[in-house]
């Protein structure tokens, strides 16, 4: 019973999904502590908000408050190995231990869950939907997979709204713990084959997820996916996409750094919506978020205002410099289909500019499974700088490195492989028009220094 526990201990406290739960338990007045492998801006924020976090794998650092097994809940992320010393201590001593996804499922079961699932697009779409609800007369609680730029957090709380917006993560089948009232499914391009084994098993996981949507609710699925939904009786199915489906956009106008669209629903049309983050892919993300909002009573005017005031998500098309001569942004894209969408959206905005990307592959298994697809997507760029693979939870795989991607890039593309720490020196000598940092690893830690370098160079040239 989550209400009666007094302390919560997190093994892997710095993950984006874990941090939303930490903030939730802090808001409930619980004593919160945990371990993470490395300090980050996120863990420092959590400490400032009241959590106790340490960075050594050491049982003696677990606070006494968290050693009372009758009053302590232990939450861990699948990225943490079972032999981790602290996790092993809790297992050996009979503590109640749950995965993050199980705890999230328990917390949200009593509310109307508005979930967003899919290989990619789910963080932006769920954050956009949360903003549409939060700024409307309805409100919402939200557990997000990224930091909302509107609110500076990945957790929104409402004491009155029946709705909870949830990013539904398919990794480790986490989303099977949820009980959605409604769900968007954005994409089902195979991923996490280290967990699923085959593309068919990955699709089957999404099919099972559709069976969890509650009668009276709805599935809003992107038109054209390979997935065959298997919903319960009483669950409506709607389709959406950029250009067709029950929900779609018309009269799309892109120019002068702005995007305007008309939103078309089965029973309404909202004209002249301005996208607060004017990137091509946000047309489709926006259609899904607006569909969720419209079906649950957010008014047309509130939708229009919310789309215009949406400021985006950290590390998702996150512009750091935007001038006539120089553009620099970072984007979390780490799957081949996602990278292709990112590059096409950037190309749409900057047709005549040279586009350079620094890409850090994320996971050895993903690189092994998709290196040719990564090369195809990155070949849409003018120049590619590859860094070493970010391992996250994995051990190296013999023969798997960034060189696999490098060797399969299209002939004629400018390309190099560079150590992370050498990137600033490399960029100092390069003419840059549009630069994008791609990936879900720790390359983002270098973004502030790259920003300073490019700003200094721009100032010295002006």
What is the meaning of each model-derived region?
Residues 1-115, 128-130, 244, 248, ...:
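Short, basic phosphate-binding NTP loop
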Residues 2-7, 17, 24, 28, ...:
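Nucleotide phosphate-binding/pyrophosphate-handling subdomain across enzymes
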Residues 7, 72-73, 182, 218, ...:
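Structural motif
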Residues 24-30, 47, 61-66, 78-221, ...:
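Phosphate-binding loop of NTP-binding sites
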Residues 30-37, 219-223, 356-359, 381-391:
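Short internal beta-strands
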Residues 49, 236, 375-433:
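C-terminal helical cap/extension that packs against the catalytic core
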Residues 70-71, 422-453:
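A glycine-rich beta-strand to alpha-helix segment
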Residues 95, 201, 209-216, 341-350, ...:
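P-loop/Walker A phosphate-binding loop and immediately adjacent motor/lid segment at beta-alpha junctions
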């Amino acid at each position: 019973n989550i209400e009666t526990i007094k302390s919560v201990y997190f093994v892997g406290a710095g993950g984006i999904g874990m941090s939303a739960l930490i903030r939730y338990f802090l808001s409930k007045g619980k004593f919160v502590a945990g371990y993470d492998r490395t300090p980050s801006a996120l863990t420092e924020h959590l400490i400032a908000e009241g959590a106790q976090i340490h960075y050594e794998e050491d049982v003696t650092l677990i606070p006494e408050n968290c050693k009372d097994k009758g009053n302590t809940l232990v939450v861990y992320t699948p990225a943490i190995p079972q032999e981790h010393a602290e996790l092993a201590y809790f297992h050996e001593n009979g503590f109640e231990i749950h995965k993050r996804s199980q705890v999230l499922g328990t917390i949200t079961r009593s509310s109307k869950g508005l979930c967003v699932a899919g290989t990619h697009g789910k963080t932006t779409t769920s954050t956009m939907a949360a903003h549409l609800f939060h700024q409307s007369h309805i409100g919402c609680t939200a557990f997000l997979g990224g930091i909302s730029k509107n609110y500076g957090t990945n957790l929104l709380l409402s004491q009155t709204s029946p709705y909870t917006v949830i990013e539904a993560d398919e990794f480790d089948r986490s989303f099977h713990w949820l009980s959605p009232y409604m769900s968007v499914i954005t994409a089902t391009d195979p991923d996490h084959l280290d967990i699923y084994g085959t593309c068919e098993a990955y699709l089957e996981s999404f099919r099972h997820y559709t069976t969890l949507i509650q009668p009276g609710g709805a599935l809003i699925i992107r038109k054209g996916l390979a997935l065959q939904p298997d919903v319960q009786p009483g669950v409506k199915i709607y389709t959406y996409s950029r250009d067709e489906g029950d929900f779609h956009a018309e009269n799309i106008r892109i120019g002068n750094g702005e995007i305007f669209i008309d939103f078309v629903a089965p029973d309404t049309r909202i004209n002249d919506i301005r996208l607060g983050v004017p990137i091509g892919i946000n047309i489709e993300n926006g259609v899904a978020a607006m569909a969720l909002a419209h079906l649950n009573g957010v008014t047309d005017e509130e939708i229009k205002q919310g789309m215009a005031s949406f400021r985006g998500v950290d590390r998702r098309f996150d512009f750091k410099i935007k001038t006539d001569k120089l553009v620099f942004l970072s984007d979390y894209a780490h799957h081949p289909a996602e990278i292709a969408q990112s590059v096409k959206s950037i190309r749409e905005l900057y047709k005549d500019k040279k586009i350079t990307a620094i890409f850090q592959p994320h996971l050895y298994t993903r690189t092994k499974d998709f290196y040719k697809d990564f090369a195809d997507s990155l070949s849409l760029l003018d120049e590619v700088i590859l860094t070493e693979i970010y391992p996250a939870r994995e051990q190296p795989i013999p023969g798997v490195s960034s060189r696999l991607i490098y060797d399969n890039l299209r002939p004629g593309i400018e390309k190099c492989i560079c150590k992370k720490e050498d990137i600033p020196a490399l960029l100092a000598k390069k003419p840059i028009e549009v630069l994008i940092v791609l990936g879900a690893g720790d390359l983002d830690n270098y973004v502030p220094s790259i920003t300073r370098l490019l700003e200094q160079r721009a100032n010295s040239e002006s």
